[in-house]
Amino acid sequence: MARNTKESILMASLEMFSRNGYAGTNIRELSASLGMVKSGVYKHFASKEDIWNALLDKMVAYYDQRFGSPEHLPPVPDSLEEFLAMTMQMVDFTVHDEKIIMIRKVLMIEQFRDERAKELATKHFLTGLTQMFTHVFAGMIEKELLKSDDPEMLAFAYTAPISSLIHLCDREPEKTDEALKQVEAFSRYFIKVHEGEAP
């Protein structure tokens, strides 16, 4: 039961942090949203900062398991169509999973206040993506699916526009379908430009 209460507190916190930011979220409103009193929340977490850090830990694990990370690298595709399918699956997940959308908003809001949020924003929006796709492209070059090139530069060139379109979905959710079509069109263009000569 205590575990379920902790989970409920963390999920309610995620919703409030993504909507109001850390400073705009208070324990009284958080506890009221759960039908609890403040002391009930403090039975599980010592402070708002304690909730914040536990939430980041939980969300990092959730993201890494479902999307991937430099510590949880995706497999190298065996074909260009498989690569396209992998890309679309990853993007579809990140623009439709409610928890991921909220944690991305939290990181965007809090990256200028909190050092850990800044580091996670840099990792999830830039360096982590580049590292993951450097691994993917190095493997695809080795399999001759792509022309020989610098895999890190390919990864940077590939992920930056896609990341921008994901942020567009957060700002303007009504454009999500259009953004997904743009991601697919860009991915197909990228493949066409960099396609290797595998048999």
Go through the PLM ranges and name each one.
Residues 1-3, 198-199:
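N-terminal intrinsically disordered/low-complexity leader segments
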Residues 2, 10, 56, 60, ...:
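Amphipathic, non-transmembrane alpha-helical scaffold segments
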Residues 8, 12, 16-58:
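Helix-turn-helix
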Residues 22, 45, 106-114, 124-125:
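Short helix-capping/turn signature of helix-turn-helix
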Residues 54, 68-100, 154-158, 180-183:
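Hydrophobic alpha-helical connector segments
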Residues 82, 95-119, 167-170:
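Amphipathic alpha-helical segments used for helix-helix packing
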Residues 96, 103, 115-142:
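Amphipathic alpha-helical packing segments from all-alpha helical-bundle domains
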Residues 119, 123, 137-189, 199:
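Hydrophobic/aromatic-rich alpha-helical bundle segments in the mid-to-C-terminal region
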